Design a protein with these regions (language model features):
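N-terminal intrinsically disordered, cationic/polar leader segments
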Residues: 1-111
Length: 111
């Protein structure tokens, strides 16, 4: 994937996440974006997605869990998949992580 395609795919991920949080009470969780990052802030933690254009990855860091996961685009699955071979998809992983960290989200679903 070239850099232009990478940036479009990242832009889509960030837009989907921002839309997902539009109806969420900001006292429960909110999203902030800037300079290639997207931060999900909740009472207990900060979850950060960052772009890594040189390696065409999205990196996810979850401070409260001490976790960092790198995701590559998998064209055959049309999804961002972790680079350690476990098959974790970015949105599914993030959904599971947010449920652990922010019980106030209830049945919240990522778009």
């Amino acid at each position: 994937m070239d850099e232009k395609e990478y940036r479009l795919k990242v832009k889509d991920v960030y837009a989907r996440l921002e839309r997902s949080f539009e109806g969420v009470d900001p006292d429960v969780a909110e999203v902030e974006t800037g300079l290639g990052t997207l931060a999900i802030l909740s009472g207990r933690s900060k979850t950060i997605l960052s772009t890594q254009p040189s390696v065409r990855q999205i990196w996810l860091a979850v401070a409260a869990l001490g976790v960092a996961v790198h995701f590559d685009w998998d064209a055959s699955r049309q999804a961002w998949i972790d680079d350690k071979g476990t098959g974790k998809e970015l949105f599914a992983y993030l959904q599971e992580t947010l449920r652990q960290l922010c019980p106030g989200l209830g049945e919240f679903r990522l778009g």
